[in-house]
UniProtKB/Swiss-Prot annotation:
Transporter for myo-inositol. Its main location: membrane. Residues 15-40 are annotated as: Disordered. Keywords: Cell membrane, Glycoprotein, Membrane, Transmembrane, Transmembrane helix, Transport. Residues 79-105, 154-157, 214-222, 347-349, 398-420, 477-485 are extracellular. It comes from Cryptococcus neoformans var. grubii serotype A (strain H99 / ATCC 208821 / CBS 10515 / FGSC 9487) (Filobasidiella neoformans var. grubii). The keyword Membrane applies. This is Myo-inositol transporter 3A. Glycans are attached at residue 100. PROSITE patterns: MFS, SUGAR_TRANSPORT_2. The gene is ITR3A. The lineage of its organism: Eukaryota, Fungi, Dikarya, Basidiomycota, Agaricomycotina. It is a multi-pass membrane protein.
Length: 590
């Protein structure tokens, strides 16, 4: 981001407040303007922001804000996972005949098709609607879609309902993590985004658990889909009590509202610290205004794709999303009932809990480690585990399906030991996926500057859903033509390519503020720049801590000296009496 994108900042309010000025170079016209954010006095890190973010605390208000936002993640998970357990229960309720494999694929893909449009539209309009407004619009689509699906008596009706539902899924997938990214304090931002990411597999687990319980219930599939409207209505109610993202409030001119939100997020920070945080956010928002003013949406897209830093950041997060989808993980969710039925399990819906439950557990582990190990750190640990799981699936499916010519045959009873080994491979694969892609893809907003954050998130999430669509509509056909072993071999090859790209092109964002992460792609893909910025931030924080300890030690020493040199009248009288008696009282010595 160039300096010309940023407004002048009046730092006079910082005098004698313990917060340093940022020097302003003169521009060609001789007037002063603030430096590029990458030039804080010759450093990559703004020491004043480090001081402000030292006030990060997890408060009840923050917990409420994150939990209410993460309901969108639960809806995302529930509505994508429910189809895998609901479709086997439909029977002949839609048109008088059982669903064939093509109809199942289209119904399953309906949500994905809607999500492509939802992520593109709500992502592109995220700045104008606001983060809060976009989530509320998504909730409306969730509710309408659930009602249409639950009341369906024909295949076309349920497809329409799934598409409408998908618009809500796509919008929530873009905006919810974006909203959390912009409101969470730096020190806990990873875990806060992780809450939303955890709610996705948690929603899938809930859908599988309810599905297992309604297996023998008449119209149980209708209940499964109808229950999807409950969380969306709850979020509509809770969001009435939540604020807009402070950066959107500044963008819309509500500066006092933005200051209030910052104060609630950083309750122990001084007013001067809050003011400094506000001023820095205001500078970045000026770049958004400069990009959007006087241009159409497509002109902004063209400008964004022509600018190297914007283009690289969007490519990186889009590749991250695509890599996560092209592992083939979601096929285990969408077709869990069908797949585990083919493997001979008596309750396929209960079998679907195996991948969903494993995923939820390891997403929880991953989100608890993400602020310590880092985003790249988890990728470097978890993706190799996932790749080994792919190899396990390739080999185990090959040997299990040998008696049936390499293909899965519903009429054949496979050896229970072989089935157990296959399930073990699936679980091992999901362990690696849960630690990595299952939640790390939703950290995408961290890598995008504010002026392209909504648009870039929309593009990346649209890529996610396109890749999801390709995988979901082709999976059953691949099993029938490429064999299960060949199908997972194909996913293995794509996963290796995606992993190699991310190793070289996805920088680390832990320890960096949301304003600092937007600087990573200025010159290249930012991997080395990230390491340099995080090193400088650690050194800055240590210097501030040492300074605070030094100040505390000095104050303590001065207090002791003051105490030792202060003599009360009683002590003085006792001391003088001792002198008259020819001895010096130690307790009164000075």
């Amino acid at each position: 981001m160039s300096a010309t994108h940023i407004e002048n900042r009046d730092d006079s309010f910082l005098e004698n407040k313990g917060i340093d000025h940022i020097g302003r170079p003169e521009n060609n016209n001789g007037s002063q303007e603030p430096p590029s954010p990458s030039g804080f006095g010759g450093h990559l890190i703004d020491e004043n922001l480090v001081r402000v973010e030292g006030e990060d605390k997890v408060t009840w208000y923050l917990c409420f804000l994150i939990s209410a936002s993460a309901i969108a993640g639960f809806l995302f998970g529930y509505d994508t996972g429910v189809v895998g357990v609901a479709l086997p229960l439909v029977g002949t309720d839609l048109g008088g005949s059982a669903l064939n494999s093509s109809q199942q694929e289209i119904i399953t893909a309906g949500t994905t098709i809607g999500a492509i449009f939802g992520s593109a539209i709500l992502g592109g309009w995220g700045d104008r609607l606001g983060r809060k407004g976009a989530i509320l619009v998504s909730d409306v689509f969730f509710t309408i879609g659930a009602v249409i699906i639950a009341s369906s008596y024909s295949v076309p009706q349920i497809i329409v309902g799934r598409i409408i539902l998908g618009i809500g899924v796509g919008g929530a997938a873009v905006i919810a993590p974006l909203f959390i990214t912009e409101t969470a304090p730096t020190a806990v931002r990873g875990r806060c985004i992780g809450v939303n990411a955890f709610f996705i597999p948690f929603g899938q687990v809930v859908s599988d658990a309810i599905g297992a319980g309604v297996q023998n219930m008449h119209n149980g599939w209708r209940l499964l889909f109808a229950l999807g409207a409950v969380p969306s209505l709850l979020q509509l109610l809770l969001f009435h009590y939540l604020p807009e993202s402070p950066r959107i409030l500044i963008l819309k001119g509500d500066t006092e509202g933005a200051r209030t939100v910052f104060q609630r997020i950083y309750p122990t920070a001084t007013s001067e610290m809050i003011e400094y945080k506000f001023r820095v956010a205001h500078e970045y928002i000026a770049a958004t205004t400069a990009l959007q003013s006087g241009t159409t949406f497509w002109e902004r897209v063209k400008k964004v794709l022509k600018t190297g830093s914007y283009r690289r950041s969007i490519i990186a997060v889009s590749a991250l999303q695509a890599a996560g989808q092209l592992t083939g993980f979601n096929t285990l969710l969408y077709y869990a009932g069908t797949l585990f039925g083919l493997l001979g399990l008596s309750n396929p819906a209960l079998g679907g809990l195996i991948p969903a439950g494993t995923n939820a557990v390891f997403v929880l582990i991953g989100m608890s480690l993400v602020d310590k190990v880092g985003r790249r750190g988890l990728l470097l640990i978890g993706v190799p585990i996932m790749l080994l799981g792919h190899v396990w699936n390739i080999v185990s499916f090959y040997y299990m399906c040998k008696p049936t010519g390499g293909f899965l045959d519903t009429s054949y009873s496979y050896d229970t030991t072989d089935v157990g080994i296959v399930i073990g491979g699936i679980v091992f694969f999901v362990v690696g996926y849960g630690l990595t892609y299952s939640h790390l893809v939703w950290y995408q907003a961290e890598y995008l500057t504010l002026e392209v954050r909504s648009m870039g998130s929309g593009i990346a999430t649209t890529v996610c859903w396109i890749a999801n669509l390709v995988v979901s509509v082709s999976y059953l056909s691949e099993l029938e033509t490429m064999t299960p072993s060949g199908t997972y071999g194909f996913y293995f090859g794509i996963s290796v390519i995606g992993f190699v790209f991310l190793v070289f092109c996805l920088p680390e964002t832990k320890q960096l503020s949301i304003d600092e992460t937007s600087l990573l792609f200025e010159d290249d893909w930012g991997v080395k720049r990230s390491a340099q910025m995080r090193k400088e931030r650690r050194e800055t924080r240590k210097r501030l801590q040492d300074a605070e300890l030094g100040e505390a030690a000095t104050a303590h020493l001065e207090a002791r000296q003051q105490k030792s040199t202060s003599v009360s009248p009683a002590e003085l009288s006792k001391f003088m009496a001792g002198l008259k008696g020819g001895k010096r009282t130690p307790s009164a010595s000075v």
